[in-house]
Curated annotation (Swiss-Prot):
The modification Pyruvic acid (Ser) is found at S63. Its cofactor is pyruvate. Its EC number is 4.1.1.50. This is S-adenosylmethionine decarboxylase proenzyme. The active site is at S63, H68, C83. GO terms for biological process: spermidine biosynthetic process. The keyword Nucleus does not apply. Is synthesized initially as an inactive proenzyme. Formation of the active enzyme involves a self-maturation process in which the active site pyruvoyl group is generated from an internal serine residue via an autocatalytic post-translational modification. Two non-identical subunits are generated from the proenzyme in this reaction, and the pyruvate is formed at the N-terminus of the alpha chain, which is derived from the carboxyl end of the proenzyme. GO terms for molecular function: adenosylmethionine decarboxylase activity. SUPFAM superfamilies: S-adenosylmethionine decarboxylase. Keywords: Autocatalytic cleavage, Decarboxylase, Lyase, Polyamine biosynthesis, Pyruvate, S-adenosyl-L-methionine, Schiff base, Spermidine biosynthesis, Zymogen. Pathway: Amine and polyamine biosynthesis; S-adenosylmethioninamine biosynthesis; S-adenosylmethioninamine from S-adenosyl-L-methionine: step 1/1.
């Protein structure tokens, strides 16, 4: 691979508002999505806003997953950034879309740390 990692920017629409407004459930689903993708979870931090919305991050050995929700719009903005080749960020995005009971998801993949020559990084 000539890139250090893959960064998925996902727009998830038509989600269940009750799910998107539940901090504990969002944290659980985000951790599950990281594990579903084959990642190793290191740390988590989530915050519930008033009157609604949740933001959070799951730090993984391979990078991170982040989310910001707008329950009133049924919308979640999700970033899944993974380094190396053993973790598939699309698996996490698809898992989240399913668990949020979303109507649809659009996403863009960005290669991060692109080098002209193949790179070899320890433990990746």
């Amino acid at each position: 691979m000539n890139a250090l990692g893959r960064h998925i920017l996902a727009e998830i629409y038509g989600c269940d508002a009750a799910i998107l407004n539940n901090r504990n459930l969002i944290e659980k689903i985000m951790v599950e999505s990281a594990l579903e993708a084959g990642a190793e979870v290191r740390e988590v931090a989530f915050h519930k806003f008033s009157p609604q919305g949740v933001s959070g991050v799951v730090v993984i050995s391979e990078s991170h997953l982040a989310i910001h929700t707008w329950p009133e719009l049924g919308y979640a903005a999700v970033d899944v950034f993974t380094c190396g080749e053993k973790v598939n960020p699309w698996d996490a995005c698809n898992y989240l879309t399913e668990r949020f009971k979303a109507k649809h998801m659009t996403a863009t993949e960005v290669k991060r740390g692109v080098f002209e020559e193949p790179v070899k990084v320890a433990n990746l």
